[in-house]
Amino acid sequence: VGSEMCIRDRTAGILPINVQKSGIDVLCFSGHKGLLGPQGTGGIYVRPELSIRPLKMGGSGIRSYEKEQPAAMPEHLEAGTLNVHGIAGLLGALEYLEKTGIEMIYKRERELMHLFLEKIQGIPGLTLYGTDDLQQRVPTAALNIGSCDSGYVSDWLYENYGIAVRSGAHCAPLMHEALGTREQGAVRFSFSHVLTEEEVRIVAQALREFAEEEMQQ
């Protein structure tokens, strides 16, 4: 019987999960997205009964004269010098999340996303991807303007308004294959709880300005 592995690269710190109820044996997560930690951090949950072979060996510090990693977890998977600065930063982020409240943060981010989706309605040439059910959306929005390359849209927003968005394939090639956007990519907007409603309105207006200029050409 195989093991159940789950990748939570983008939803850790955003959506709740119970590994026992979900029957997950291995859970991998990134630390620099929903958990607000530094880049280069992340973690892995391994069901205690599961045996995993280390990808790398050596430099464990506590077993310097042995070729094999210590049997105990998590040292079993921790070869070499750890990213102590990154781990400290991730700890600080987790403490902030615990103090502020994940539910409060998520609620605020969704409110800002809803405002953005409301303000971009009617933008010429706009294609919004994902479900129309706002309750099923996480606080991101992926879209395109006509046939404009997503990188071009991203550059325009940054150069004219200092707005930073993500363009391209977003490490999701199969999704773009399914959407037919392999060459164009998509422009992704992510909403932080520290944004203001006025900033969201400015972003929506900038996108409208870009679209109206492009559609006139």
Feature annotation, model-predicted:
Residues V1-C6:
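Short, small-residue-biased leader/transition segments that mark boundaries at the very start
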Residues I7-R8, L27, I44, L90, ...:
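Buried hydrophobic positions in well-ordered alpha/beta secondary-structure cores of metabolic enzymes
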Residues A71-V84:
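A short glycine-threonine-serine/GTX helix/turn-capping micro-motif
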Residues G146-S150, E197:
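Helix N-cap motif at beta-to-alpha junctions
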